[in-house]
């Protein structure tokens, strides 16, 4: 038999997981007051473990107890016992569950292997009541079984968080790119300033050379030079302070404009937390109502289908004809025939049962209509909820920004007051210097004084150029930093987008993986078991409503469906599609087990629980049970199977551990 690629991948993964455990180690299970068991202590080895025994020997009770300590549904307690216990020693760790019967219910306490009850009940404990097996036997919803462990709510919340983060990063990138647009003009300005500064330095150098040629009094020349230098320095300082004051005033005015705009926007916002709470409360009620309606519709549909089968099956043992069954009227009109009701035992005409079924069908239609209305209202409320949340978030942002603006305006006012005082001081010192220079009018009129004044002006001009050039260089350095930040943000944005795509397709990917796993394993199983006339059993993914995070899940109410197909083959080798109902009980049980195996692998259950429990395989013949167990053993490090003696004898191999089942207490 050629192994499918998907099956090979899963075998490799399970093999890697098995290597992480002590594969020579044993699993010890102790159970007390579980089902028909008073007390038992069993040890299992890695590989296949067979619980060999007849019915009523406690095999199923032990498996149910083991499922409970693994993390599954609590088992049934023995008789009238009020307390029970299951203990599991595995891989160096002891797990336990204590069960107490209280007020008609069983309460559990202790440390199970996992808190994921759904994984254990769906894909680990494959007893007669396993949902995957029942879904095939009862023609149930396969997708619901396989996809039940997926937390769509968590996926939705993660998508919303990623969208918010992506939008925030996008806004920051756009702001940075607006700033980067200034690079060309700043670079050009830097080139101009460097050129102007070189020219200014050259003029200063030439003027100083000219001053050295004058034969003026050195002390007097030095005194006037110092005075003029101080005068120009004070002018430069005064201009710098004036520029700073102008900048602070412009910034304060811009803040006040922004403050006014935000206050106007906040006044225009109309929102109500009470309305949001009302919507959330209503959403909770409607969601609960939708689940309740879905359950009711499923239950009523099952009742209608069951009773339709009974009414249409004249040979049903549950419908026993009354004394008037052989009357001429009954033969002419079978619907008037009286039968014994299979629920209460009274005599009733068939047409009354048919009428009751019509009433139930009408009720199912009413419930479906009501569910559709509820789903529509849920969608509308979720849209309103999102709009309100966005408005409230914007209002909070405005309030926070207004608070920041108020603080900034107060800070600007304080800075302006300090700068005004500083400007007055500089004015005073400047007046004193101007008075000193004016007293030396005669010297100022000389050529020497004019040249010193020109030198002072050039040095002042040079200082202005250096200051502006330094500012331009700082702005260019900031643009370099912003460019690096933009590149990092774009990389982060790409990662977020990739995760968004992954989250949005996660449901579909899981569905397709589950279907591929089922189809591949089913193909291999059919090749191994060789059922007559069955060429193929496969699942087709039927598109339904797509998962939409902005509307809280699947729009329209119906998700994707898994449709099971059966292809048979005539004696001449011609294939044709048959119905699922045509499958024998044995074939249905095998299909159900493969559905559970697909879920076990797709959801990586073996990473948490490297164990699988099989029971109620009597519908399958012994040779096929042996082949099935051998196949499943490749995917479960510990496979525990409850079998009748004649079925257990068909299993061979040194790796199979047989445990005689005699756990049930004698009454």
Curated annotation (Swiss-Prot):
GO biological process, one term: double-strand break repair
An example Gene Ontology molecular-function term: ATP hydrolysis activity
Coiled-coil ranges per UniProt: 153-295, 355-517
Compartment(s) where it occurs, according to its Swiss-Prot or TrEMBL record: Cytoplasm
Protein keywords: Coiled coil, Cytoplasm, Plasmid
Primary localisation category: cytoplasm
UniProt-listed InterPro entries: P-loop_NTPase, Rad50/SbcC_AAA
GO CC annotations on file: cytoplasm
Family: Belongs to the Sph1/Sph2 family.
Function: May play a role in replication.
Identification of the protein by name: Smc-like protein Sph2
Gene (UniProt): sph2
């Amino acid at each position: 038999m050629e192994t499918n690629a998907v099956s090979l991948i899963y075998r490799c993964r399970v093999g890697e997981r098995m290597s992480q455990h002590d594969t020579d180690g044993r699993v010890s299970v102790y159970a007390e007051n579980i089902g028909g068991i008073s007390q038992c202590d069993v040890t299992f080895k890695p590989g296949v473990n067979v619980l060999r025994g007849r019915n009523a020997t406690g095999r199923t009770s032990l498996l149910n107890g083991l499922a409970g300590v693994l993390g599954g549904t609590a088992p049934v307690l023995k008789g009238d016992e009020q307390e029970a216990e299951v203990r599991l020693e595995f891989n160096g760790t002891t797990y336990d569950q204590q069960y107490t019967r209280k007020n008609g219910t069983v309460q559990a306490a202790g440390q199970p292997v996992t808190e994921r009850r759904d994984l254990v009940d769906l894909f680990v404990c494959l007893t007669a009541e396993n949902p995957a097996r029942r879904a095939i036997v009862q023609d149930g919803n396969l997708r619901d079984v396989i996809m039940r462990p997926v937390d769509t709510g968590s996926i939705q919340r993660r998508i919303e968080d990623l969208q918010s983060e992506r939008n925030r990063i996008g806004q920051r990138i756009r702001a940075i790119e607006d700033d980067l647009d200034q690079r060309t003009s700043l670079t050009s300005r830097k080139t101009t300033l460097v050129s102007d500064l070189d020219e200014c330095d050259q003029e200063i150098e030439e003027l100083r050379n000219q001053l050295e040629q004058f034969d003026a009094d050195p002390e007097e020349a030095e005194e006037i030079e110092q005075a003029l230098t101080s005068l120009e320095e004070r002018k430069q300082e005064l201009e710098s302070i004036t520029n700073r004051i102008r900048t602070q005033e412009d910034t304060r005015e811009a803040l006040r404009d922004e403050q006014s705009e935000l206050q106007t926007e906040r006044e225009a916002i109309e929102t109500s937390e009470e309305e949001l709470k009302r919507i959330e409360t209503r959403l909770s009620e409607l969601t609960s109502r939708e689940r309740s309606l879905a359950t009711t519709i499923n239950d009523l549909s099952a009742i209608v289908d069951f009773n339709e089968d009974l009414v249409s099956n004249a040979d049903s043992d549950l419908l026993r004809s009354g004394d008037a069954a052989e009357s001429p009227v009954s033969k002419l009109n079978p619907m008037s025939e009286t039968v014994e009701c299979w629920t209460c035992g009274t005599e009733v005409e068939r047409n009354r049962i048919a009428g009751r079924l019509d009433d139930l069908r009408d009720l199912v239609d009413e419930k479906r209509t009501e569910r559709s209305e509820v789903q529509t209202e849920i969608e509308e409320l979720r849209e309103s909820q999102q709009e309100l949340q966005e408005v409230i978030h914007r209002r909070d942002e405005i309030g926070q920004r207004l608070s920041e603006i108020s603080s900034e305006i107060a800070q600007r006012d304080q800075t302006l007051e300090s700068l005004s005082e500083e400007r007055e001081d500089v004015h005073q010192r400047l007046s004193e210097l101007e008075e000193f220079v004016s007293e030396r009018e005669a010297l100022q009129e000389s050529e020497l004084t004019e040249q010193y004044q020109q030198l002072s002006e050039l040095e002042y001009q040079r200082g202005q150029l250096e200051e502006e050039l330094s500012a331009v260089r700082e702005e260019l350095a900031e643009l370099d930093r912003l460019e690096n930040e933009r590149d990092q943000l774009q990389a982060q944005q790409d990662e977020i987008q990739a995760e968004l795509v992954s989250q949005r397709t996660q449901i579909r990917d899981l569905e397709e993986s589950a279907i591929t796993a089922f189809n591949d394993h089913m193909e291999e199983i059919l090749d191994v078991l060789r059922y007559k006339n069955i060429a193929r059993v496969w699942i087709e993914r039927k598109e339904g409503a797509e998962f939409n995070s902005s509307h809280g899940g699947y729009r329209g109410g119906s998700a994707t469906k898994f449709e099971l197909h059966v292809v048979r083959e005539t004696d001449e080798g011609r294939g044709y599609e048959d119905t699922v109902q045509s499958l024998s009980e044995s074939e249905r049980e095998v299909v159900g087990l493969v559905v559970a195996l697909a879920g076990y692998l797709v959801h990586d259950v073996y990473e948490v629980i490297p164990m699988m429990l099989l029971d109620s395989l009597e519908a399958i013949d012994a040779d096929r049970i042996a082949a099935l167990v051998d196949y499943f053993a490749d995917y479960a490090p510990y496979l525990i199977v409850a079998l009748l003696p004649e079925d257990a004898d068909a299993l061979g191999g040194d790796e199979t551990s047989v445990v005689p089942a005699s756990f049930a207490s004698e009454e």
